[in-house]
């Protein structure tokens, strides 16, 4: 009986220990104690009940304690519950402390929750980043297109990481400054001879205002001559003027052809009227003879006049033809 009761008690104790070890991360608790971080078992159980992974909080807490940061489990747990990356924020605070950068945990947590990489921002504050722009084209006053590529050295401004503009804004502003500087040059050779004028002009405009970066320098990496935009525009304008002139000439030619056809139609109309009038002459003559208005002698005189007129016209036509043929011979 004694042995059976002892076995039952031992089984109960083992089951209780298994349940305890599965619910309470005893190994993590021992690691915290060994690192000098005092975390109660009740705190770990409370994290389990709040669906917080104790390792996600205690491991960064141990790291912060070893680095000399004064952080509490409540700070780390609240950031974890807000959806932040606790380990990255703690790493950023450690890096900021080593670099003598003022970065409270609350600011780092806010930067992390805003979607920024706070650790990368701290690293960029220590080691500035170089942003290379694509080729940016501008046209000088003499019409020559110049393309320039710039390298922008920036340092993260931790105070403006939340709400500050990103790299795209920096590139766009620098590109605008390059285009403006090239466009204000009277000759493209000025840009080739003094490319540093571009960087000086652009840097003096304070392009980093409202951004999450501080511009340290702008260096022109490459300058290329593209094409003569002014000549191309003049060529296109001349071609457009030529097309307009051709269109107007074609319009005038079409109007002239239409007018010619109209005149031909009128000539044919007049000829038809003449033929119609000539067809009425015999009838009028017959009526005049019948009524006695003219005599037979008058009629023959009229016929003689018509014959004489026809003969003269024939002679004139033949003379004109001979005059036209004589220069050709």
UniProtKB/Swiss-Prot annotation:
Q: What is its main location?
A: membrane
Query: Where is this gene product found?
Result: Cell membrane; Membrane raft
- Keywords, ordered alphabetically: Cell membrane, Membrane, Transmembrane, Transmembrane helix
Q: Name one Pfam family in it.
A: FloA
Among its keywords, does the record have Transmembrane?
Answer: yes
Tell me what topology the record assigns in the membrane. Multi-pass membrane protein
Q: Which domain of life is it from?
A: Bacteria
> Membrane-spanning residues where?
4-24, 26-46
Name the GO cellular-component terms: membrane raft; plasma membrane
What's the family? Belongs to the flotillin-like FloA family.
Quote the subunit structure annotation: Homooligomerizes.
Biological role stated in the UniProt entry: Found in functional membrane microdomains (FMM) that may be equivalent to eukaryotic membrane rafts. FMMs are highly dynamic and increase in number as cells age. Flotillins are thought to be important factors in membrane fluidity.
Q: What is this protein called?
A: Flotillin-like protein FloA
Q: Source species, please?
A: Staphylococcus epidermidis (strain ATCC 35984 / DSM 28319 / BCRC 17069 / CCUG 31568 / BM 3577 / RP62A)
Q: Which gene encodes it?
A: floA
